[in-house]
């Protein structure tokens, strides 16, 4: 597995700004060419420069997998059209929900999704259909309802909040169909998503992520 440390706009919270699946990586405009080349090389995807809700916080607003991409209702028409036209083999839908931080509230791979407990039945149905997952479940991770913020799951493995119990880990492994471990990023942060961007081909970690954290991440994501 390719793994590289990265900073974006002077911060190690790279997952706030970047969304990836195995086909596309959506990045904010304004990154230098070297950073863009590194991202594309490590993740092995096509890069798209975009905004959501006139913001560069793409990792916060976007959730998805290889089948589909979900955008918040605050997405502006031209932003939606751009992604719809360029994400050619992904379904792209707007989730009409009061919840807009979809990256923080939906945790998914190609098999399953764990979602924010307060999504309603209609929202759950749209999420399931758009992502094309077999299983979907509302729940928490380590008592955190923002499940997307405290985990990263690929089709090869996953890393979640360090306080996740053994029972929870087993339930998550059954749901997603992969081995999952606990850990931290960026020198002790439990908000895994903020410091980790990964797909089945590669991994980017925040620049302050330590050697021991990286070893744990590599093991968890199936290297």
Swiss-Prot record:
SUPFAM superfamilies: Pentein
Cysteines paired by S-S bonds: none
Post-translational modification: Modified in an unknown fashion (not phosphorylation) following release from 50S ribosomal subunits.
Matching InterPro entries: eIF6 (IPR002769)
A GO term, aspect molecular function: ribosome binding
SMART domains xrefs: eIF6 (SM00654)
Keyword Protein biosynthesis attributed: yes
Induction: Constitutively expressed, further induced by cold (60) or heat (90 degrees Celsius) shock (at protein level).
Listed GO biological process terms: assembly of large subunit precursor of preribosome; cytosolic ribosome assembly; maturation of 5.8S rRNA; maturation of LSU-rRNA
Keywords, in A-Z order: Initiation factor, Protein biosynthesis, RNA-binding, rRNA-binding, Stress response
Pfam families for the chain: eIF-6 (PF01912)
Annotated Gene Ontology cellular component terms: cytosol
Subunit structure: Associates with the 50S ribosomal subunit, specifically with protein L14. Binds to 23S rRNA, possibly between where the 30S and 50S subunits associate to initiate translation.
Annotated function: Binds to the 50S ribosomal subunit and prevents its association with the 30S ribosomal subunit to form the 70S initiation complex. Inhibits translation of both leadered and leaderless mRNAs, maybe by binding to the 50S ribosome subunit, preventing it from binding to the 30S subunit.
Stated family: Belongs to the eIF-6 family.
Protein name as annotated: Translation initiation factor 6
Protein source organism: Saccharolobus solfataricus (strain ATCC 35092 / DSM 1617 / JCM 11322 / P2) (Sulfolobus solfataricus)
Gene: eif6
């Amino acid at each position: 597995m390719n793994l590289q440390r990265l900073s974006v706009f002077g911060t190690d919270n790279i997952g706030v700004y970047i969304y990836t699946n195995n086909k596309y990586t959506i990045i904010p405009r304004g990154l230098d060419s070297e950073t863009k080349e590194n991202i594309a090389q490590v993740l092995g995807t096509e890069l798209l420069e975009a905004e959501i809700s006139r913001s560069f916080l793409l990792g916060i607003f976007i959730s998805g997998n290889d089948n589909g991409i979900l955008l918040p209702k605050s997405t502006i028409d031209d932003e939606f059209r751009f992604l719809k036209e360029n994400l050619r083999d992904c379904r792209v839908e707007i989730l009409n929900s009061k919840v807009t931080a979809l990256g923080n509230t939906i945790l998914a791979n190609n098999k399953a999704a764990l979602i924010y407990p307060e999504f309603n039945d209609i929202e759950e149905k749209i999420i399931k259909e758009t992502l094309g997952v077999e299983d979907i479940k509302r729940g928490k991770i380590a008592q955190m309802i923002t499940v997307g913020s405290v985990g990263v799951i690929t089709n090869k493995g996953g890393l979640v909040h360090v306080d996740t119990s053994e029972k929870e880990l087993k339930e998550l492994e059954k749901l997603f169909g992969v081995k999952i471990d606990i850990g931290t990023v960026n020198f002790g942060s439990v908000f895994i998503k903020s410091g980790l961007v990964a797909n089945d081909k590669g991994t980017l970690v925040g620049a302050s992520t330590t050697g021991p954290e990286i070893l744990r991440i590599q093991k968890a994501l199936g290297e």
